[in-house]
């Protein structure tokens, strides 16, 4: 990637992005109690948090809990703190400039680099969609006995859901996503209560221990957790959807909006921390505690939960949460895809066409691999999707950090020096760990 940031060569309006009529469509109270302003800003953070608990993260958390107990909870906490910083920067970019990350790249980079960044981001969205197809198909099989191949094809029908929600406005999208997040929260809350993990051991797991880096198997899983935590398309998504709020486009209005937006995303990502930690805690309390350190796949975990906990409801709750996770990811991935395509290319497709195109590309490998290699093949395909996401991540993080440090672009909301330094450290850690993960993957 070129190190030069070129001046804006063409005017870019916020309406050029993927929000359309949703731009500044959510009213923000100008007075009254602070609680009402907070409620007005709640939503984008929860949309973003979906990417931190999608089906692609489940296998890593399950493997970490079953193999190492509560050891890797500290890694989940660390990766979540990294995500909070980067998503805060994404919101800062959108609020300060009125541009999303894709628009900022188009404005500041030459055409060739933009096309490359767009292609890489589209690849990441397809990889994310691949994980959603697999997760949703597995959930349909676990709940209704639908074969994986047929379940993967059925997921194409989610375009109807996306269309219905988009036609009802952006707040309807947010409400739907938050309702399904609540379903996931309740499902795992009940499962954790049934598993009754030792509180002292859980709390101790959040304290970093040397074994995380001295044990090569634990380190490998730790890299996987961190590498899969920050979804590249989330950085594009967040910088766009924070602009749905009708805050005053003045320095004071933007500063206030930034405070509320960061509060929203921080609280939402702590919610995601609970879900990811709950998956690992469940695996540790049920599988690791009883000597089953080999549980790494979603279907395997589902099959073992009921007999090992002695409660049939546990497996059902697990599958319901998985289905909610897959459906939720569908909504946010569709929106991110529109934002990326319209931001980089100024190419606007109808949402149903965009959704069918992306989902169609994702369904084909799932159907083919399931037909040729069975369910074990889909598990490997799920891992591959996370590796593809890891490959794209640096190409979203690095432009973001460079932009928020540019006073000419950000104006009064330029990121402070300490935050920029912290962001570069996080970026280097993520890039380094992803490179190591890719190297390990290449070596088998």
From Swiss-Prot:
Main location, first listed in the record: membrane
Any GO CC annotation of this UniProt entry: plasma membrane
GO molecular function, one term: manganese ion transmembrane transporter activity
Similarity-based family: Belongs to the NRAMP family.
Signal peptide span: none
InterPro entries (UniProt xref): NRAMP_fam (IPR001046)
Location(s), subcellular: Cell inner membrane
Species of origin: Xanthomonas campestris pv. campestris (strain ATCC 33913 / DSM 3586 / NCPPB 528 / LMG 568 / P 25)
Pfam families for the chain: Nramp
Transmembrane intervals: 31-51, 68-88, 115-135, 146-166, 175-195, 212-232, 267-287, 303-323, 356-376, 381-401, 413-433
Family annotation (HAMAP family): NRAMP (MF_00221)
Biological process annotations from GO: iron ion transmembrane transport; manganese ion transport
Keyword terms, alphabetized: Cell inner membrane, Cell membrane, Ion transport, Membrane, Symport, Transmembrane, Transmembrane helix, Transport
Name this polypeptide is given: Divalent metal cation transporter MntH
PANTHER family, A to Z: NATURAL RESISTANCE-ASSOCIATED MACROPHAGE PROTEIN 2, SOLUTE CARRIER PROTEIN FAMILY 11 MEMBER
Keyword Lyase among UniProt keywords: no
Membrane topology: Multi-pass membrane protein
Function text: H(+)-stimulated, divalent metal cation uptake system.
